[in-house]
């Protein structure tokens, strides 16, 4: 999905949130960090990614469109926090104490590492596997690891090894 397919109102709301949180951080930190580049090119099940070297935030347009309010409230500050931590502290753990501090104390947003958005529309192919108690859907990546003999997956409920159907 290209940026042009995202309604302009959603793009504007994303920019408002980004600028609001950046201004808040600059004020609290006594700095003048620049506005990062923003693109809507993230694919797959990730809501967004922060690219440190290029100082860029990439957002998933499908998840943004399907979860606009929560996405703008949580994901935009989450990715901005990664860039601000990198500028402020240098290279540290991605969701470490510095990031948590930046999220909660500086940006005033709960520090959650993962989103809870429905992923059905962005999931690619899955492969059916079975155990004693249920059927599981493995991602392409996990399926390929099983095929290459690089991984064995077990059911979290019964503990049995998953077998392709």
Swiss-Prot record:
What binding details are noted for the cofactor? Binds 1 zinc ion.
Quick one: which residues bind Zn(2+)? 78, 82
Which cellular compartments is it found in? Cytoplasm
Domain SprT-like, residue spans: 20-163
- According to UniProt, the name of this protein is Protein SprT
Q: Which InterPro entries match?
A: SprT-like_domain, SprT_Zn_ribbon, Uncharacterised_SprT
GO BP terms: namely: response to stress
Please report which protein family the annotation says this sequence is part of: Belongs to the SprT family.
Q: Which NCBIfam families match?
A: PRK04860.1 (NF003421)
User: What GO terms fall under cellular component here?
Assistant: cytoplasm
Q: Which UniProt keywords apply?
A: Cytoplasm, Metal-binding, Zinc
What is its cofactor? Zn(2+)
Q: Which Pfam families match?
A: SprT-like, Zn_ribbon_SprT
Active site residues according to the UniProt entry: 79
Question: Major place of localization?
Answer: cytoplasm
Q: Which GO terms describe its molecular function?
A: zinc ion binding
Give all cystine bridges in this chain.
none
